[in-house]
Every structure is written in C-alpha cells, then in structure tokens.
C-alpha cells in the first residue's frame, strides 16, 4: 500500500490511497482541472481512480467530489449526515452512486479495507478513516477539535499516520483571525493544535510507525517547523523525520 497527498489545508484537501489496482481519493476539495493536474504530478490519470471517500461536507473537502464522480462514473462513500448536507453539490441531471456508510462499521473497497470512526468537528456527521491492505495500516485524522479514547484506539499501532497539526496556540491567539473564528478553530469542534496532536501521539503504540505526516496546517497560525518540533519531541526523533502535507503540493508517495 502507498499513499500521497495532492493538497492539504483550508483551500482544499485530497489524498490518494493505493493498493494493487485500487486507488481511492480521500476527500476532493479541488476543482476538476486542478485535481487532474495534481493527479498527473503523482503519476496517475483521472480514469484510474476507483472511488472517493468523504470525511465531511465542508467545501475544502467535498466541493469537487460530485462532478468528478459523475464524469468518471465512480462511487462516493460518505456518512448519512454528510449525504444530507451535500445536496448543494449534486450536479443536476447526472446520476451519482452515493454509498452511505456506518461510521462504526469497516467495509471493503476492492483491495483496501476501510475502517471509519466518528470525530468531534463542526460538521453533520464527520468521519475519519484507517486503511489496511491486510498487512499494514494507515491512520488518517485531519479535522477534529479534540482527541477521544475511541480515536486513539483506532490509531494506535498504525504503520503510518497522517495527523492534523492545524495551529500553534500562541499564533492563533495573536493572529489575524476574528475572535469568533479563533473560538471556532480552537474549540472542541474545531481543529487540533500542535500540542494536542503531540499528546494524542504520545498515547498511541508507535512501535510500528514508519511514516508520520503533519497535515492541515494553517497558513496563518502555524509553521511546519513548529508542527515538526511538537511531534518529534514525542517520538524522540529528528524534526526532518516528520513529514509535512502542504497546501501547494501535499506530499509525495509514501510506501508501506
């Protein structure tokens, strides 16, 4: 199994998870031309995508999914709450294969097993995912205000983690956001700060961990160096070992 990011941040998110002939997009918050270009940068063609999994309905995660899926005749997996909230995206006159999932029930998409889990975020029924090829697991957590025991039980023992490090608390406090937006981002249904991500990581069994990527970094309230330092301190490793998913280019393929 291998995985890459096409983009990560408030302007658009999309990951690719691949095993065998199965290639899944996790979220699709990119326009069609941008998505096609970024897939080419990872050596892929749009026709090679098996399907799309959505974490929640926010624009930066979902806005490009439905036209892409309709054009390429591929299914979309999403929670019931997300399904209810995405009506505004659905293209008129085009049929879509929307597959509603139970956020506590694993399911199989060809060569990849997908284990969903609910998270606290300000969306209708937000869900994050752990992916497995039968030998290795990739845990993804990109939009949550806080950790929970269930989140940690899902992510413990993974071979790879993509972990939200959205903001530095001091930078958010002193940054340009309005008081209301600061409260939202830093709240229990907002986004995970560097310190909270580090504490979550410290609660996991990381003995099998081969890759860790800090994701969904705020351009105004964080820096890659701060996110790397927070996670590296937990793992007792050099900062350079902590990967960064950025807005411009995501991150290149990582293999398990």
Model-inferred region functions:
Residues 149-246:
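Cap/insert and terminal regions of metallo-dependent hydrolase folds
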Residues 4-14, 56-65, 87:
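Structured catalytic core of nucleotide-sugar glycosyltransferases
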Residues 58-62, 84-85, 123-124, 146-149, ...:
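Active-site environment of divalent metal-dependent phosphoester hydrolases
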Residues 26-29, 50-57, 77-80, 139-142, ...:
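Active-site neighborhood of phospho(di)ester-bond hydrolases with catalytic His/Asp-centered motifs
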Residues 32-78:
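Active-site metal-binding motif and surrounding structural segment of the metallo-beta-lactamase
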Residues 80-128, 132-135:
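Metallo-beta-lactamase
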Residues 63-72, 87-89, 222-229:
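Metal-dependent catalytic neighborhoods of phosphoester/phosphodiester hydrolases
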Residues 1-42, 127-143, 160:
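Conserved beta-strand hairpin/beta-sheet module of binuclear metal-dependent hydrolase folds
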